[in-house]
Structure formats: structure tokens, C-alpha cells
Amino acid sequence: MTDMPKTPLLDLVHRPADMKGLSDRQLVQLADELRSETVSAVSVTGGHLGAGLGVVELTVALHAVFDTPRDKIIWDVGHQCYPHKILTERRDRIRTLRMKGGLSGFTKRSESPYDPFGAAHSSTSISAALGFAVARDLGGVVPEGLGDAIAVIGDGSMSAGMAYEAMNNAGHLKKRMIVILNDNEMSIAPPTGAMSSYLSRLYSGEPFQDFKAAAKGAVSLLPEPFREGAKRAKDMLKGMAVGGTLFEELGFSYIGPIDGHDLDQLLPLLRTVKARATGPIMIHALTKKGKGYAPAETARDKGHATAKFDVLTGQQTKAPSNAPSYTKVFAQSLLEEATKDDKICAVTAAMPDGTGLNLFAERFPSRCFDVGIAEQHGVTFSAALAAGGMKPFCAMYSTFLQRGYDQVVHDVAIQRLPVRFAIDRAGLVGADGATHAGSFDIAYLANLPGFVVMAAADEAELKHMVATAVAHDDGPIAFRFPRGEGNGVDMPEVGEVLEIGKGRIITEGTRVAILSFGTRLAEVQKAGEALAARGITPTIADARFAKPLDREMILDLVANHEALITVEEGAIGGFGSHVAQLLSDEGVFDTGFKYRSMVLPDIFIDQSSPADMYAVAGMNAADIETKVLSVLGIAQIGEARA
């Protein structure tokens, strides 16, 4: 068991107000203790370590200078919020991070008044801060009051268009608000795009002219890790038109870059900004992800997301794998197909590792594109690749594909362009909770004309679906698969091209048919075994396709059974709704046929293990068994054999 760190000063700080009497020297000590406590807590729970370590000093400075919760600190994404939670009355629960009934791994309004705006997806903080600033000036009333609005946003999040939309609007409205650019040059993947080469221009404009003089020669005063970033200013100045930085052109007063780990810089700067700011301010702070904890600093992803680990060594404790992950199966299957077909290319939005496309990039760098946190652009870029004769695989998490939905409709579906959507993290994903659940993609894709929508029941099926997507050139096609390990099934050497819109019968039975879409098939089969012990043998089928439906198979199941139950890892309005529409159109319900659809409930399910989340959703084997007994009108074991 890891020893708890000694934190005598932090032990006295239960809320930000307790910091007001501390000297600047004591705040430095507080930051050191806060860093140790963050490392200790995440070693127990796992979670996003590196981001929080990179903003420890910034977190201390913000809470020491501003008056939270009246002043609103909005953490973009929220990965970096663990130190903030420790300082804001939640230290006693910090070792429940991301656990069932515990603290969220992100900011969450329902959890604390110190979390004024929830987050988990990126690039929303500036819009939210502007909204608070406008609400303040219009006389809005909230229990904690409305003071300053401060957005803390990383350089990775600055690759998303929404951040610039917000800055453009903020510059126009000229409201007093503060944006702190947390520039660590290391989001999850290396930062992408021209913006990453722009961020270090040493300049600051009105009303902070005194900072200009201090900025001269500041590069030489920065610690070595920060010098290189600051030197990028020289390259940018060569091609710049007269008129200040991009941020100033958008209407912000710009200060920076400063050392985001030096409280001797942060504290006086924030105090000056608080006292003198009149309009929107941009503070550019250079930080280091994983700062102060060597295993995180030296990790390739700077400790972005970790399992539980040993504090002394940084060694993570992960359970041994019994089967390859779905993500790895997808990536390897795509690599095999790309070896045979040079038209295959891959697109991801700042998630090369998470989607497995880092493997593709190593093998085929000229055919792999990380577009940054820019799902809208990524989808349209993929559409034009398809229009140009390529075979693009647009690999995104289900929850993030939502951000590019208009492009899916307007640029892909309406034009019937053969973009292949590889939808990872489908269904309930566990510790990241509701913000990362892949609950809605079946519904929002299967309602689009001409869209083919598949779901893999196991890892072998996923391999077949990759091959099917490669071969499909008649419009868009999507296949979804969950987070985590596969079922350990035998893997085919080569993926088989599936017939579009055709499912498969797994086991033949009588009375009731269970039609599964996706990886709940394993739970359906467990339910089938339990039902067999009761004398009930259901027919079990794997739909494979939510669109187009296998009309022939479904209507045959109806013709030969008393009841049909569909099961899917998606929200209301998805696969089951399409089956119900088919049955309605065919007049099946006119005969009194019994139909039930098992879907995710109409709630956002809080974090837990995926198994616990599916238990809450009523989607496990026992729930399926109960549904079968209910639809057949069987309440007791003895009735089943009657």
C-alpha cells in the first residue's frame, strides 16, 4: 500500500477561502503538497494524471487570487481538474475518482458549486466563460453570485474551431473575461496544425504596456524546457503582417508567454489582471504535462491516462488480457486491408492511440491523417477524400462523432459518399461516465437515407466488418464496437465481406426469438442458457445490420414465434425502433404479435464499471431472461415446462 504523503499545509486548506491568509512562499509549499496528493490519489484510482500535474501552480494561483465560487473557473475538457477538486472541499473523496458513487473525473455542476460548468469534451470553456460574463453584466442571479469568468484551455483544445468562434464573439462583445492558454505542447497526441507553431509570440498589448518591457529578454530567463517554445516567436514574426497577434486581432489583450509553473510570475500577473482588466484577456502560460512526477514526465503521453500505479516506480497495475481489445482488432484488420489496397487511408481527430491508428501511421504515414480536435473538419475532409477516389476510414469515438454530425448529414450522406466510419467506444464505457458514453450513434446514423450501419457482436465479426467496409463503395457505411477486450473467439485469418443487410441465426429455438445488435449477443447467449434450464429454448439471432434491416430474417422470426425481443447497446430510437417500424408497416401488430425492445434507458448513467452500468441499464443476461419470461407470461419456474 502506498504511504500517504505528508501535507501539513494542505491539511489546513479545506476550501479556497482558507488560502487567502497564506503568504506567497506558503503558496509555493501548498503547490508542492498538492502535487504529491494528486499523485497519491490517482495511484489509487487511476485516471488522467499528467494534465492535472501540469496545472498545479496555476490552480493554486487562481484560487488564491480569485474569489471562487463567485468567480467562475471553467476547466476545458476537465482532465486537469483533480488538483482543483482537492482544493474545493472534495479532498476527502478524491480517492473515489471515477468510481461508482464517487467523484467524477471531470468538472460536474451537480457535484460542487466550484464546478460552474461541466465538461469532458474539448474546446467549450471560452464559450462558457463568455456566457457567464454576459450573464453577469445583464444582472443574472445565481446562488454563489457572478464575478469574473476564467477559462483554462489547453493548446490541444485550441485546434478546434469552437474555441475561435468563441474568441471572435468575445472580442466583439468586449466583456471582461480571462482566457488562460495552458500551452504544454502535448495534448493526448502531438499537437496538430499551424496553430501549434504560432503560440509563443512574446507580446502583450493594452492595457498592459508594462509587461512589454518585462518580456524583452524573457526567453533567457525561462527554464530550459520553456526556451524552445518561446523561440518560436522569431519564426512567426518573419511572416506576420503588421497588426499584432492573432488573439489581439480577435479583440483580446495578450500577455505571454509566461512560466506556468512559477508562482512568482503567476501570482502578481493574476493580481494585476484582476485589478486592471476591462475587456477580454488572453494569458499564455507555458507548462509541462506531468510536471514534478518523473514517471509521468518521461512517459510518451506524459501520463495522460493511467491505471492504478505504484508511486515510487510509476509501474501501472493492469489485469492481464485474455483477448485482444476491439480497438486493436480494428487497427490490425485495417492494416492488413491497407497492405493490399493503397487507396485505403485513415483519419482521426486527435486520437491516434485511442483509435489504434498510431499503428497505421507508423506503417503508412502518408495515408494517415490526425486532423486535431476537429471532428467537423475530419468528417468533411474524409468526404472529399472519398470524392477523390480514396477509401477513407474515419475513426472516431461514438461520443466525439456527435460533434461532426451536420457534416455526416450534409457532406457525406446527402452526397452518398463512401466514407467508412469506424465508431469506437460504442455503448457504455465505464469510468468516464455519461459524457463519454456511445449511446446515440445507432439512432443518429440509422435514420439517414442510404447509410449502412453495422455493429460487431464479437472481435471476429469486427474483422469481417472492416473487410465489408473496404468493399462497400455505394455510399457511407459505419460499424460500431465497444471499449475493452473481445470475447476470445477464434479469429479468421482473412476478413469476410458480409452481404449487406443480412443477419445470421445463432441458435434455433421456439416460442420466442431474441434478435441482438452488437456485443450484447454474449449476454443474450447467457440468458439463453439460463432459459434452457427452465425448459425454454429461444431462437437467438445476430442482426449485424441496423440499416438496412434483414427484412426476410426478421419477418421469418415473426412468422415462427410468439414473440420477438430486440437487444442493443444504444438509446431509444435506434435498432429496435427500426424493427418496430418494419413490423408496423407489415401489419404484424394487427395480429396481436408480442414485441419488446431492450435499449438503454432514457437517463444519463453515471460512471461505474461497464458491467455495473449495464446492470443499471437492465441489459445483462438476467435482465434479458426476465424480459423473455415476462413476454411469455411466465412468472414461476414450474410454469415454463407446462
UniProtKB/Swiss-Prot annotation:
Cross-referenced InterPro entries: Dxylulose-5-P_synthase, THDP-binding, Transketo_C/PFOR_II, Transketolase-like_Pyr-bd, Transketolase_BS, Transketolase_C, Transketolase_CS
Positions bound to Mg(2+): D155, N184
Protein's recorded name: 1-deoxy-D-xylulose-5-phosphate synthase 2
Listed cofactors: Mg(2+); thiamine diphosphate
Family note: Belongs to the transketolase family. DXPS subfamily.
EC number: 2.2.1.7
Textual note on the cofactor: Binds 1 Mg(2+) ion per subunit. Binds 1 thiamine pyrophosphate per subunit.
Keywords in alphabetical order: Isoprene biosynthesis, Magnesium, Metal-binding, Thiamine biosynthesis, Thiamine pyrophosphate, Transferase
Gene Ontology molecular function, alphabetical: 1-deoxy-D-xylulose-5-phosphate synthase activity; magnesium ion binding; thiamine pyrophosphate binding
Alphabetical list of PROSITE patterns matching this protein: TRANSKETOLASE_1, TRANSKETOLASE_2
Catalytic activity: D-glyceraldehyde 3-phosphate + pyruvate + H(+) = 1-deoxy-D-xylulose 5-phosphate + CO2
Lineage of producing organism: Bacteria, Pseudomonadati, Pseudomonadota, Alphaproteobacteria, Rhodobacterales
Coiled coil stretches, renumbered: none
Record keyword Protein transport present: no
Gene3D superfamilies in alphabetical order: 3.40.50.920, 3.40.50.970
Species name: Roseobacter denitrificans (strain ATCC 33942 / OCh 114) (Erythrobacter sp. (strain OCh 114))
UniProt cross-references to NCBIfam families, sorted A to Z: dxs (TIGR00204), PRK05444.2-2 (NF003933)
Keyword Thylakoid: no
SUPFAM superfamilies in UniProt: Thiamin diphosphate-binding fold (THDP-binding), TK C-terminal domain-like
Pathway named in the protein's UniProt entry: Metabolic intermediate biosynthesis; 1-deoxy-D-xylulose 5-phosphate biosynthesis; 1-deoxy-D-xylulose 5-phosphate from D-glyceraldehyde 3-phosphate and pyruvate: step 1/1
Role played: Catalyzes the acyloin condensation reaction between C atoms 2 and 3 of pyruvate and glyceraldehyde 3-phosphate to yield 1-deoxy-D-xylulose-5-phosphate (DXP).
Positions of thiamine diphosphate binding: H79, A120, H121, S122, G156, S157, N184, Y293, E375
One Gene Ontology biological process: 1-deoxy-D-xylulose 5-phosphate biosynthetic process
Subunit structure: Homodimer.
